[in-house]
């Protein structure tokens, strides 16, 4: 069950672990864990104010054996606000 598993999100371009379980491991306050209360299987990564520099591959990992993982490509369209 997902209740006894750790879900982590990693940014692939620099291998930076952004979140693990409910903890955020980046000083960039735009990142947060999205985990609706009562839904143990839903773990998302929220990024507010995405910028072109944020584009790239992000990977969700679950500490199962073997490890479960799913990659997501973030594409940012539009102009960057200054």
Regions found by a protein language model. Name each.
Residues 31, 80-81:
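Active-site/binding-pocket entry motifs
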Residues 2-32, 73-75:
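N-terminal V-set
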Residues 8, 15, 53, 57-80:
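Extracellular/luminal immunoglobulin-like beta-sandwich modules
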Residues 16, 22-57, 64-66:
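Extracellular beta-strand/loop-rich beta-sandwich domains predominantly from IgSF
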């Amino acid at each position: 069950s997902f209740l006894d598993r750790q879900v982590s999100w990693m940014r692939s371009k620099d291998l930076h672990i952004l979140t693990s379980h409910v903890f955020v491991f980046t000083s960039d306050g735009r990142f947060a864990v999205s985990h609706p209360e009562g839904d143990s299987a839903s773990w998302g990564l929220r990024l507010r104010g995405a910028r072109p520099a944020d584009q790239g591959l992000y990977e969700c990992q679950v500490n199962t054996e073997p490890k479960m993982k799913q990659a997501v490509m973030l594409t940012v369209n539009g102009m960057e606000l200054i």
